[in-house]
Amino acid sequence: MTLGDTLFTLVTFLVLMLAVGKVAWKPVSKMMADRQQKISGDLDYAEKSRKDADALVAKRQEELQHSQADAVKIVNQAKENGEKLRQSLVDAANAEVTTMKKNAQTEIDQARKDALASAKNDVADLSLTIAQKLIGKELNADDQKGLIDDYIKRLGDANGSH
């Protein structure tokens, strides 16, 4: 290669570089700058999305803890209400049993009194009949009362000694 060829190649290369620089360099540079901006924007968006996701995870975790605490409170309240209801039912049953015992005792006492009164009347009638047959006469009311009271007293003494 001669100096002329080298010079020609150099000039041609420079002209070609200027032409490419004028025609293609600006669009290629713009395209590279746009691509750099897009990549930078995508990285910023990805970082923001990651931070948002982390914040959302933290928020959900906090809500979950609050939900668990609320669930524990609800369960404890339900247990407490159940225990109160159970105690109320037990108290009501105990009160009913006590009332039934009192009523039964009252009925027993009344039946005993009625039986004693009936026995007293039967004994009085029997005593009066026996006394009339033995004495052969009718007793007046005071005599009857005295005989009956005396007989009941002796019955009470006899029952008390057994």
Curated annotation (Swiss-Prot):
| Recorded GO CC terms | plasma membrane; proton-transporting ATP synthase complex
Indicate the family of this protein.
Answer: Belongs to the ATPase B chain family.
Entry function: F(1)F(0) ATP synthase produces ATP from ADP in the presence of a proton or sodium gradient. F-type ATPases consist of two structural domains, F(1) containing the extramembraneous catalytic core and F(0) containing the membrane proton channel, linked together by a central stalk and a peripheral stalk. During catalysis, ATP synthesis in the catalytic domain of F(1) is coupled via a rotary mechanism of the central stalk subunits to proton translocation. Component of the F(0) channel, it forms part of the peripheral stalk, linking F(1) to F(0).
Which coarse location class describes where this protein primarily resides?
membrane
Q: Give the matching PANTHER family.
A: ATP SYNTHASE SUBUNIT B, ATP SYNTHASE SUBUNIT B', CHLOROPLASTIC
Instruction: From the record, give the transmembrane residue ranges.
Output: 6-25
This protein's assembly is summarised as: F-type ATPases have 2 components, F(1) - the catalytic core - and F(0) - the membrane proton channel. F(1) has five subunits: alpha(3), beta(3), gamma(1), delta(1), epsilon(1). F(0) has three main subunits: a(1), b(2) and c(10-14). The alpha and beta chains form an alternating ring which encloses part of the gamma chain. F(1) is attached to F(0) by a central stalk formed by the gamma and epsilon chains, while a peripheral stalk is formed by the delta and b chains.
Q: Which UniProt keywords apply?
A: ATP synthesis, Cell membrane, CF(0), Hydrogen ion transport, Ion transport, Membrane, Transmembrane, Transmembrane helix, Transport
Checking InterPro entries in the record gives: ATP_synth_B-like_membr_sf (IPR028987), ATP_synth_b/b'su_bac/chlpt (IPR002146), ATP_synth_F0_bsu_bac (IPR005864), ATP_synthase_B_chain (IPR050059)
* Identification of the protein by name: ATP synthase subunit b
Q: Which CDD domains match?
A: ATP-synt_Fo_b
Q: Where in the cell is it found?
A: Cell membrane
Q: How does it sit in the membrane?
A: Single-pass membrane protein
Q: Name one GO molecular function term.
A: proton-transporting ATP synthase activity, rotational mechanism
